[in-house]
Amino acid sequence: MIRRWLTSRLYDAFLVCAFFVSAPRIFYKVFFHGKYIDSWKIRFGVQKPFVKGEGPLVWFHGASVGEVSLLAPLLNRWREEFPEWRFVVTTCSEAGVHTARRLYESLGATVFVLPLDLSCIIKSVVRKLAPDIVIFSEGDCWLHFLTESKRLGAKAFLINGKLSEHSCKRFSFLKRLGRNYFAPLDLLILQDELYKQRFMQIGISSDKIHVTGNMKTFIESSLATNRRDFWRAKLQISSQDRLIVLGSMHPKDVEVWAEVVSHFHNSSTKILWVPRHLEKLKEHAKLLEKAGILFGLWSQGASFRQYNSLIMDAMGVLKDIYSAADIAFVGGTFDPSVGGHNLLEPLQKEVPLMFGPYIYSQSVLAEKLREKEAGLSVNKETLLDVVTDLLQNEKNRQAYIEKGKSFLKQEENSFQQTWEILKSQITCMKI
């Protein structure tokens, strides 16, 4: 009991220190980019969320857009088979909240940003909502949120779980201090055997662990619409043009690609730059200007009729807009401090996939893609040659598309396995 109390106080102190260290960056985003203004009352516990109706409640949580998006087939199936349940969906980012509202409010879900995990804030929210089940997407588990839910009698599950090598070392250190961070979880449904070994290394019993594959490979028919013609028309791309979509781009990705794009000046190759963070838009623009690349902004009505390069300065469209591409690159993979983003979205839109050398956030998936030749791993030296070959050789592009489709087909049963495991837990509960 004393150790648990001490751990909670130390954790609170760590969060407070982290807040003050991050405060300058946070306030910069508030005053110069208008971020967090709509969500601060919920984040700091000034305003408490309210869930309508009666009946059992399941609380889903994911860090941001990707983690909450993969919940879509799960919520749809849950609503079909257990309509008496109420849904709550939380996320840590404003972009994630916008995505969750678009996807889940029509299903009757209550969506809001997750309050800060300080014990004086999150515990009162958990007590008010009193969830019967809490489901964490991929690994964004928060200590007080998890432990307070368990104290009130909730079941807690991790789905599509993963644990990086860096995180494994960090949680192994906590284990040596006598704290198993993930111990309160009832079940861990993981993407891969490697992640299973890492969770076992930090003290999780194998009896709690199921390996089902990556849920992101599952495409619900209602979500699999390929809007290639729609987006190519909106972007004003002719049938002779070839489009490269550079998704989730960070400044270091832009630096590498700017050198390559300069070789396609005045050609039929069009480049769509999609920043990961809109607050870095000016930095992206300066890098393109420095490289002598003329570009337009989507928000200002620019199109490929006027420019060979466009910056897509709008949130929430990347996954859909991949469908317009002839080649796609996933950003964050030329930046060792980032380590990549969702590699599956281009494949789901039947587009050849490229990614850089830094992909440790999804290293297992990246290795699978390389083994199946469903994705191209490139570096600064090979990038221009690979892009040129794909642009000039339609057969090669089609071969990568087919290999991507085959890869997704082999992995698509992961959702069904995950659902069957969760369903068995739901039906056993006495609500």
Curated annotation (Swiss-Prot):
- Name its pathway: Bacterial outer membrane biogenesis; LPS core biosynthesis
- What GO terms are given for molecular function? Kdo transferase activity; transferase activity
Reaction(s) catalysed by this chain's protein: lipid IVA (E. coli) + CMP-3-deoxy-beta-D-manno-octulosonate = alpha-Kdo-(2->6)-lipid IVA (E. coli) + CMP + H(+); alpha-Kdo-(2->6)-lipid IVA (E. coli) + CMP-3-deoxy-beta-D-manno-octulosonate = alpha-Kdo-(2->4)-alpha-Kdo-(2->6)-lipid IVA (E. coli) + CMP + H(+); alpha-Kdo-(2->4)-alpha-Kdo-(2->6)-lipid IVA (E. coli) + CMP-3-deoxy-beta-D-manno-octulosonate = alpha-Kdo-(2->8)-alpha-Kdo-(2->4)-alpha-Kdo-(2->6)-lipid IVA (E. coli) + CMP + H(+)
* InterPro entries (alphabetical): Glycos_transf_N, Glycos_transf_N_sf, Kdotransferase
What role does this protein play? Involved in lipopolysaccharide (LPS) biosynthesis. Catalyzes the transfer of three 3-deoxy-D-manno-octulosonate (Kdo) residues from CMP-Kdo to lipid IV(A), the tetraacyldisaccharide-1,4'-bisphosphate precursor of lipid A. Thus generates the genus-specific LPS epitope of Chlamydia, composed of the trisaccharide alpha-Kdo-(2->8)-alpha-Kdo-(2->4)-alpha-Kdo.
| Originating gene | waaA
Query: Example GO biological process term?
Result: lipopolysaccharide core region biosynthetic process
Superkingdom of origin organism: Bacteria
* Residues the entry annotates as binding CMP: 275-276, 315-317, 342-345
> What does the sequence similarity comment in the record state about its family?
Belongs to the glycosyltransferase group 1 family. Glycosyltransferase 30 subfamily.
Keywords carried by this UniProt record:
Cell inner membrane, Cell membrane, Lipopolysaccharide biosynthesis, Membrane, Signal-anchor, Transferase, Transmembrane, Transmembrane helix
Protein name stated in the entry: 3-deoxy-D-manno-octulosonic acid transferase
| Membrane-crossing residue ranges in chain numbering | 5-27
Q: Fetch the Pfam families from UniProt.
A: Glycos_transf_N
Regarding the membrane, this protein is recorded as: Single-pass membrane protein
User: One cellular component GO annotation, for this chain's record?
Assistant: plasma membrane
Origin organism of this chain? Chlamydia trachomatis serovar D (strain ATCC VR-885 / DSM 19411 / UW-3/Cx)
The protein's site described by Transition state stabilizer is found at: 138, 216
What EC number is given for this enzyme? 2.4.99.12, 2.4.99.13, 2.4.99.14
Q: Which residues form the active site?
A: 67 (proton acceptor)
List where in the cell it is found.
Cell inner membrane
- Transmembrane helix recorded as keyword: yes
- The enzyme's main class, written as a single word, is transferase
